[in-house]
Amino acid sequence: MNPADLEQLMARAKEAQARMAELQRELALRRVEGSAGGGMVKVVATGELRILQIEIEPSLLAAGDRAMLQDLTAAAVNAALANAQKLVQEELQRASANLAVPNLADLFGAGERS
């Protein structure tokens, strides 16, 4: 490998590193929502896969069905996290396309799962 190629490779690596740090900051600010029970339970998550908020319809609490509340909450959390993972995957694919490097989503384990 000639020195110019190595220099270019290092420059791309630095650019990719800077873009990933920027993307991480952006994802921390992005919000996605998941819901269950026709919107009776809503969950807000970040692009960092952190749960920020859970909203439960008062009528669901008044019903007193603990098992249903637990199921709907779990479903809404899972939906929010799935939406956050999709957001991360899309942003990583976009970043890797802009940098002309292999799919970064696969490198970070956020690629599609079977």
Task: Give, region by region, the residue ranges found by the protein language model.
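A broad detector of the eukaryotic-type serine/threonine protein kinase catalytic domain
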Residues: 6, 56, 77-78
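N-terminal intrinsically disordered, cationic/polar leader segments
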Residues: 29, 35-54
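Long amphipathic alpha-helical segments used for membrane anchoring, targeting, substrate engagement
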Residues: 1-28, 33, 83-114
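A short interface-forming secondary-structure element
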Residues: 50-69
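Residue-level signature of catalytic and energy-coupling elements of molecular machines
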Residues: 13, 49, 73
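Stable alpha-helical structural segments in soluble proteins, enriched in small hydrophobic residues
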Residues: 72, 76-87
